[in-house]
Amino acid sequence: KKETLELMETLDLEEPIDRDVYNVGFGLIHQQYDMGEQVGKVLGHGGNTTCHHSMFNYIPELDVGIVVMTNSQSAIGFYATAGMTVLVEYLKEKGIVVEESKAECEHIKCDSNDMVGKYATGLGMMEIKRNNKSELVTKVSKIPIRLCPCKDGYYQCTPVKVIHKIPIFKSSIQGMRLKPATYLGEDIMLFEQSGKYHKTKGVIGCKYERTDIPDSFRAACGNYTIADEMFKDIKCKCQLKVEGEVLVLEIAALNVKLNSCLKVVGEDLAILQGFGRLAREMVKLQKKDDGYYLTFSGIVFKKI
């Protein structure tokens, strides 16, 4: 109904995450994509199961939208990219100006330590600290970066190693910015990623919470393979490990790599640390006569 859609287009939250960053309202994600003032607010949603992926985005002010659906086991990254590509091309065809997004930002001098700390993200542990030059540094997907403060409160990622200063790497790294925030009492980390015609905004993770690792989980560490018959044809790598006294679950499948810090809540139960859809997802451990089994997101894995 029209009234339902109008309600979904409103953002009536007691405490929004950030007015300039995406928020989840009544079934719609607000401002996950920033395409500039000429385009206006972009709303949408998406979801997936193991073998099905779909997303849609639309612009109320322009009465324009796009829906992308697949039933491929390897298209989880494709459908979002394709959806935005088609939407941009449609807007350009209609004569609506879509400017290329710019990653350049004016840097300022800032001695704040608000960013310092350990964060649990979908890319694994992100530890932000100051080096011997008092610069904020960290690693994103094992790539060392420097964080430069910007006027709007964000910190722009800049490359450290010479090889990452090659234009193709440099533009990708500098296109990412991070910002600390507090939501409902929880310290979280916002991110902004500049694409060619839009900026993607969201939450990358939250402050890491230290957890004791019992012997049951230490003994279960190792490589796992899918035990479920219905998922046996899916190529998947799964590993449970301890890195620097941090319990980590690493899964690579369907063109997606998940590297999550775990919080142990029992001898055979842990949850993912982070923020968003996968945060607090349960990881169930079970020891049988033929070895260790691990259940995550409804899929059973067996230790190799």
Q: Would you name each region that the model predicts?
A:
Residues 1-232, 241-243, 250-257, 263-304:
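Catalytic loop of the DD-peptidase/beta-lactamase superfamily, centered on the K-T-G motif
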